[in-house]
Swiss-Prot record:
Keywords recorded for this protein, A-Z: Calcium, Cell membrane, Cytoplasm, GTPase activation, Membrane, Metal-binding, Repeat, Zinc, Zinc-finger
Residues given in the record as Ca(2+) 1 binding sites: 21, 27, 74, 76
Organism for this UniProt entry: Homo sapiens (Human)
Disulfide bond entries: none
Protein name (Swiss-Prot/TrEMBL): Ras GTPase-activating protein 4
Length: 803
């Protein structure tokens, strides 16, 4: 049993930001930190005070996180980036909004004294003395302190205050993981109410010392427990007066939703999974209660989530095609007009969208990737609408005359015809590259629609049904927003975005089979009509070949594609492998091409190199970040593993940005999460000379000074399926609509009492709805009887001691 937390984050836009550049504008981007750990960086939106990002992320993290902060920054090419402001949401604030926090939040000024992070290890004792009780405070060590100096470290010391007396530890130079092991004693007076204050500071020779955080201990509670030892989270100084600058720094529109799930062992979900799978296997031949009932009881706002959870569950069971086939039949049974077929946001439409994103994303990248990259690289000005043509944007400098409007329109049409032709040609050649399960699903869709709407007058309807998903809900959205489909790392600029929009419109016209209705909407698209008409013929030929797959061919193709399984993650990185003593600088990194599969992390000089080295996946013990000071550069991670002889080794890898760093860390953590011997602690520094750079510990193989973060990952489109989590999410949804399910059960069983499902032998066998209600009841009891998931990082007694 495990407790899991997921944070859905959507950074929408900003408004009324202050100008940071001499041009009267800014180049804003966002950094997202969870407990002061940077995990996300948005794209930079250039030269604007009202940026739009529209970026979505989902982060899996331990349930013990405390806060998520959004920093709006101004990018500068020549100097350090400026901080515009921040929005901080505590875990409690997010959890108080069951449907998620959504809306505008004012940016506030970043106060260095509030940028507190890390924990301090204390041993606290109350023991009797000759005249009065004594309070003993042992300051042992600290970890993950905020780096306050330019070299990426701090020079921390601790100040302990009680009843007007102040004691200080020694200063540990250049460390965010200091060890003191110093003890201070104070005399306790009976009935004294004053608290013990432990403050961490960064010592500075010239300027004032920087505040690193504090812990305030309730001495009266400590008297009761007599002795306590543990890690205490450092807190900001709440006594400081806050500046009232809300609104002066602009606002940020956010959507943040927290989902906490307690996932039971697989055996608990088997009855639910078996029941749903049985319903799908029966299809329209059986009573068919559950799937239609789930659709009926699912609200519009959560339909996409429910569709995705069901789709992933059945995909893991090998029943995705059968599940979607059942939904196709249900939707066709209630559709009489061909022009409304699969155009609503039904469970069938949402499930098919999710299916294509889960099963067809690699295929999409193979078809669209080269075309999208070419559009981004060319940066051509493209416009077909005469009312929007701006000749000045395309004028030729030097001796050449500016282009006329007619020339701009003709050149734009030629460019779009070339892109559309290249896309359709790539699509026509891609039949064998399409996953077998996707082809088989489209085959079922094509057949069901043709059976429902036979006759020559409906000849195009099966083709339009396929293109309504393939073109209108998959290819066109990916063309318009390539970053959201992982085709590009950054959003398109205004010029490229317009080209992509026009190309997406052309693809939609082809997908609509060039109907008169689609042509009448925008007459200025007429120059593309010859290519569109030719594309319709190409697309129909492609679909005919796509759906021409039999069961045997499906199995053979699936087997072939599975042998060509793509890497989990690949790309160029810089590597430095430890070689004992000597300085480690960023210049010693060597660029290699890395490929992570479910078997190993391999690396070579080029992607096509025959000779490569590898780290076996089963040997990986941790994947963590490295302190910036260690190599004089940021975005460095370490892969800790054992070689074939069982000796511990470390490979240091440098990424180009914080997003790439976290993507690689996420991928490595996901594929190694079930490894035996995973580390619980590690050193975020390097062993230089005769000691670790982080904590100055001299024992190379000693216990790490920081805890590992193997559960902190980013959700990606190619994540492995988690059957237990999907089953838990479906259970949680059904539990939310249980009252509606009982109401339907009473209707079907002639007014039986809610909560009374027949169980006696000899009675009529339970129908599927009654069995579902019983399964929900059993799961509810399993949740209530099982202990809570992972223990919190701080015992309750430590939290109670802090005031």
């Amino acid at each position: 049993m495990a407790k899991r937390s997921s944070l859905y984050i959507r950074i929408v836009e900003g408004k009324n930001l202050p100008a940071k550049d001499i041009t009267g504008s800014s180049d804003p981007y966002c950094i997202v930190k969870v407990d002061n750990e940077p995990i996300i960086r948005t794209a930079t939106v250039w030269k604007t005070l009202c940026p739009f990002w529209g970026e979505e992320y989902q982060v899996h993290l331990p349930p013990t996180f405390h806060a998520v902060a959004f920093y709006v920054m101004d990018e500068d090419a020549l100097s350090r980036d400026d901080v515009i402001g921040k929005v901080c949401l505590t875990r409690d604030t997010i959890a108080s909004h069951p449907k998620g926090f959504s809306g505008w939040a004012h940016l506030t000024e970043v106060d260095p004294d509030e940028e507190v992070q890390g924990e301090i290890h204390l041993r606290l004792e109350v023991w009797p003395g000759a005249r009065a009780c004594r309070l003993r405070c042992s300051v042992l060590e600290a970890r993950d302190l905020a780096p306050k100096d330019r070299n990426g470290t701090s020079d921390p010391f601790v100040r302990v205050r009680y009843k007007g007396r102040t004691r200080e530890t020694s200063i540990v130079k250049k460390s965010c993981y200091p060890r003191w092991n110093e003890t201070f004693e104070f005399e306790l007076q009976e009935g004294a109410m004053e608290a013990l204050c432990v403050e961490a500071w960064d010592w500075d020779l010239v300027s004032r010392n920087d505040f690193l955080g504090k812990v305030v201990i309730d001495v009266q509670r400590l008297r009761v427990v007599q002795q306590e030892e543990g890690w205490f989270r450092l807190q900001p100084d709440q006594s400081k007066s806050r500046r009232h600058d809300e609104g002066n720094l602009g606002s940020l529109q956010l959507e943040v939703r927290l989902r906490d799930e307690t996932v039971l062992p697989s055996s608990y979900y088997q009855p639910l999974v078996h029941l749903l799978c049985h319903e799908v296997k029966l299809g329209m031949q059986g009573p068919g209660q559950l799937i239609p009932l789930i659709e009926e009881t699912t609200s519009t706002e959560c339909r996409q989530d429910v569709a995705t959870n069901l789709l992933k569950l059945f995909l893991g069971q090998g029943l995705a095609k059968d599940f979607l086939d059942l939904l196709f039949q249900l939707e066709l049974s209630r559709t009489s007009e061909t022009n409304t077929l699969f155009r609503s946001n039904s469970l069938a439409s949402k499930s098919m969208e999710s299916f294509l994103k889960v099963a067809g994303m690699q295929y999409l990248h193979g078809v669209l990737g080269p075309i999208i990259n070419k559009v981004f690289e060319e940066k051509k000005y493209v416009e077909l609408d005469p009312s929007k043509v701006e000749v000045k944007d395309v004028g030729c400098s030097g001796l050449h005359r500016p282009q006329t409007e007619a020339e701009v329109l003709e050149q734009s049409a030629q460019t779009l015809r070339a892109h559309l032709g290249a896309l359709l040609s790539a699509l026509s050649r891609s039949v064998r590259a399409c996953p077998a399960v996707v082809r088989a699903t489209f085959r079922q869709l094509f057949r069901r629609v043709r059976e429902r709407f036979p006759g020559a007058q409906h000849e195009n309807v099966p083709f339009i049904a396929v293109t309504s998903f393939l073109c209108l809900r998959f290819f066109s959205p990916a063309i318009m927003s390539p970053k959201l489909f992982h085709l590009r790392e950054r959003h398109a600029d205004a010029r490229t975005s317009r080209t992509l929009l026009l190309l997406a419109k052309a693809v939609q016209n082809v997908g609509n089979m060039d109907t008169p209705a689609s042509r009448a909407k925008e007459a200025w698209m007429e120059p593309l009509q010859p290519t569109v008409r030719q594309g319709v013929a190409q697309l129909k030929d492609f679909i005919t070949k796509l759906v021409d797959i039999e069961e045997k061919d499906e199995l053979d193709l699936q087997r072939t594609l599975s042998l060509q399984a793509p890497p989990v993650k690949e790309g160029p990185l810089f590597i430095h492998r430890t070689k004992g003593k000597g300085p480690l600088m960023s210049s010693s990194f060597k660029k290699l091409y890395f490929s992570l599969t479910t078997e190993a992390l391999s690396f070579a000089k080029t992607p096509s190199s025959k000779k490569s080295a590898l780290i076996k996946l089963a040997n990986i013990r941790a994947a963590e970040k490295v302190e910036e000071k260690s190599f004089g550069g940021s975005h460095v991670m370490q892969v800790i593993y054992t070689d074939d002889a069982g000796r511990p080794q470390t490979a240091y890898l440098q990424c180009k940005c914080v997003n790439e760093l976290n993507q690689w860390l996420s991928a490595l953590r996901k594929v190694s999460i079930n490894n035996t011997g995973l580390l619980g602690s590690y050193h975020p520094g390097v062993f230089r000379g005769d000691k670790w750079s982080c904590c100055h510990q001299k024992e190379k193989t000693g216990q790490g000074c920081d805890k590992t973060r193997s559960r902190v990952t980013l959700q990606e489109w190619n994540d492995p399926l988690d059957h237990d989590l999907e089953a838990q999410l479906i259970y949680r949804h059904l539990l939310g609509v249980e009252a509606m399910l009982w109401e339907r059960h009473r209707e079907l069983s002639g007014g039986a009492e809610a909560g009374t499902v027949p169980t006696s032998p000899g009675k009529v066998p339970e129908d599927s709805l009654a069995r579902l209600l019983r399964v929900l009841q059993d799961l509810r009891e399993a949740h209530s009887s099982s202990p809570a998931g992972s223990p919190p990082s701080e015992p309750n007694c430590l939290l109670e001691l802090q005031t």
